[in-house]
Each structure stands twice: as structure tokens, then as C-alpha cells.
């Protein structure tokens, strides 16, 4: 079976070179940018495609009759392709879980601290010649509410507890070591709310206008999961009114975020470029697992 890594970017190329082994299955690597409409030409003749967050529209994949497997480098394949439609066409989508739990959790905590102390704004102002110290929020003893206690959420809870925060969580099933609360209680009590849910039809728009209104006034929101978990218009309104003090966001409804987007212009928002999972350690584990999936398929 022929395999291709269709979008190996400049960051991943050196990592790929480190993890690939002589006895691994042959996988062609494309490092050149491509337009979406070029996808059928790029995938022509391949049975397996490794995809690092490139969009895979069903109508374009349908023009690739040999393609039977897509190995998505991460968990959120549904944000980049219609998994059910592809399955109906005989294309199986494989995802990779657990590789970046610690990386994403650490980034979540970093955004929380940056938001609490307004670090990004002070950095911008100091570089521009403005010296205006900002009064921040001390996190010791504050309540961290973790919504979604999968691998990442549990890591966020563990680190939050380690820096002296009181941690409560909301999850559909019980998780050892994290006190649970009903959602309304969590939203009302939490000084910081961390979104760590998987995006699906049930969780899309989970943090709605009504639920944002139930948040503790002046709370911080951190989202390193998926942008579509949060009602964007309601979030912007809450940031403008001050009901949400600050948001630390790594994910957005549309990526990349355009510079004229309202969130990009707000002083009380700290932004990163969907990079929470991007550490050398996580990337090495991710690529190694992807290669192992190709090996299993090709047997």
C-alpha cells in the first residue's frame, strides 16, 4: 500500500527525520504548500494519507478512488473533514489520542497565568515604549473549574492543584481525584473556567449565551480544546462588558484567525495559534504513533 504524509510543515519535517526508522513502512513526504483544489492530484495513487490539520472536503476525497485511510495527526478530525461521509465512501479516518495531554495542559495553565497577570498586553506596551504596570489576579486559593475530564482535563486539574488552586470539574462520568460539581455550580464558583471537551454534535456551542451569563462575574476563560465549543458572539459580548475579565484562547471558529476579527482587537484577550499541542516531545510521540498506524494498516 502506498502512503503519503501530505502536509509535513517546516516544524514537523525535522521531527519526522528524527523519528523515522529504517524498518518503517515507506511513506512519501510532501513539504510543499498546496491549494485545497490540488488535493486530488497530490493524493493520486495513494492508499493512506497522513494529515496534519489540512482540510479534506468529501467532494475532493471522492476524486481519490485509491485512498482508503486517513491518519489524522491529532484527535479533532471532525473539524477538518466529515468523518461519517468519508466512512460511507469507504475511507476510514484514524485519530491519535493521548500524545499531547501534558503539552496541552501546560499551555492551558500558561494561558491562565498570562490572562490573570495580563502578560501579553504588558509585553506589547513595553515594546511600544509604554510603561504601565497592570494589576493582576493572584491564583493561589482561587477556584479552577475544568469542563471535560479526559486526559487533558485531568492534567489541567493536576497542575492547577499543584499551584495551590481549588479544583472542581464537570464531566459526564466520574474521574478519580477531581471533585465534581454540576455545571451551574461550577460556572458560578470558578474564578477560571477551562474548556477541555471533545467537539461533537452534543458539545458544539456548549458554552452558550445562557451559560456564559451564569459564570462568576470577572472570571477568566481558557479554551485550548475547540473554538466551536463556545458561542463566539456571546464570548465577545461578555469580554466587552467585563463579565469575563480575560480570555486565553488557542482555538477559534475559523482558523487562522484574521487580524480584523473582533477577538484580535480586544485588549483583554490573549491569543495563541492553535499551538497548545506543539512541543517536541508531543510531536515525536504523535508522529511515531502515526507511523505505527500505517504499519498496522499495511500488514
Can you describe what each PLM-predicted range is?
Residues 1-48:
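N-terminal glycine-/charge-rich "phosphate-binding" loop or analogous flexible N-terminal tail
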Residues 7-8, 15-16, 87, 92-107, ...:
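C-terminal helix-to-coil terminal segments
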Residues 41-48, 65-67, 188-193, 216-219:
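Short acidic/histidine-rich motifs immediately flanking catalytic phosphotransfer sites
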Residues 121-155, 177-181:
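Glycine-rich NAD(P)-binding loop of Rossmann-like domains
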